[in-house]
Amino acid sequence: MKLAVIPGDGIGVEVTAEALKVLRKLVPDLETTEYDLGARRYNATGELLPDADLAAIREHDAILLGAIGDPSVTPGVLERGLLLNMRFALDHHVNLRPSQLYPGSKSPLAAQPDIDFVVVREGTEGPYTGNGGAIRVGTPHEIATEVSINTWFGAERVVRYAFALAQTRRKHVTLIHKTNVLSNAGAIWTRAVETVSAEYPDVETAYCHIDAATIYMVTDPSRFDVIVTDNLFGDIITDLAGAVTGGIGLAASGNIDASGTNPSMFEPVHGSAPDIAGQGIADPTAAILSAALLLRHLGRDGDAARIETAVEADLASRGDSKVVTSEVGDRIAAAL
């Protein structure tokens, strides 16, 4: 297995080291190439994602990312120039966000044992394509636009991914949108679900407005199995999903090219947390769960399940003890 590793900034370096520790336990022939991308390189050279690095990254089976971001860089520079650029260049059209309540979780819904759903978010369209602008800036007549791009091709392939995933789970897909107001984009998404669902007669479907979905995710999260939604609504609902299941510190994610043409990227949802970087107290659990997602994406379901079982046992045994980054990685690796 050839793995491109982007530790990134802040605690990304520390948590990635623990994820690699776990991966190497299960994949002895793992070949890794590290890429220095993020705030440090940008501050030193002005480079964000050089063409040579992108071309080299394409030659790997998958990508493991730590975290990107630093107070020394203007907000938005790294996000647009590195993360979004990579997402579009590698056609990571599926953003996959599992949301499971683990034992010992600090979730406010910890008393509800059956929280286990996945959000499938479209990753390359919507209002995040940069299709907008502003005129008369600084005047009372300033106008700003952000155009949301929705295509049949983009919606259908993400919906198809969601149905295939649901068939391996509880066989239920919920489309989340705002079709009563966003009627043009909503029509594409609704027809995509109707079209693909005809090929999966054993998968039930449901629809939920985004505002109602935020209520149900708190009051009745077990109603969800696989959620499919667009880029903007997915961006919002996945953070709520993280809070419901104990916080984004435990949240793993995958940025996936479902066609397999490009390597997919896996990363913890949490940020670079520069305030605790270098102290050895960052929880690497989300990075380790991201490694499990990576293995499952590459067809190593058994190894992924072993990691998830070890993580579940580790979380259940922690109690109120303080997290030491390397010790968490050691315990989970030893449990394999």
From Swiss-Prot:
Cofactor binding note: Binds 1 Mg(2+) or Mn(2+) ion per subunit.
Q: Does the keyword Cytoplasm apply?
A: yes
Q: What are the record's GO terms for cellular component? A: cytoplasm
Q: Which GO terms describe its molecular function?
A: 3-isopropylmalate dehydrogenase activity; magnesium ion binding; NAD binding
Q: For NAD(+), which residues are the binding ones?
A: 271-283
Q: Which UniProt keywords apply?
A: Amino-acid biosynthesis, Branched-chain amino acid biosynthesis, Cytoplasm, Leucine biosynthesis, Magnesium, Manganese, Metal-binding, NAD, Oxidoreductase
Catalytic activities: (2R,3S)-3-isopropylmalate + NAD(+) = 4-methyl-2-oxopentanoate + CO2 + NADH
Chief localisation class: cytoplasm
Name of the protein in question: 3-isopropylmalate dehydrogenase
The taxonomy runs: Bacteria, Bacillati, Actinomycetota, Actinomycetes, Mycobacteriales
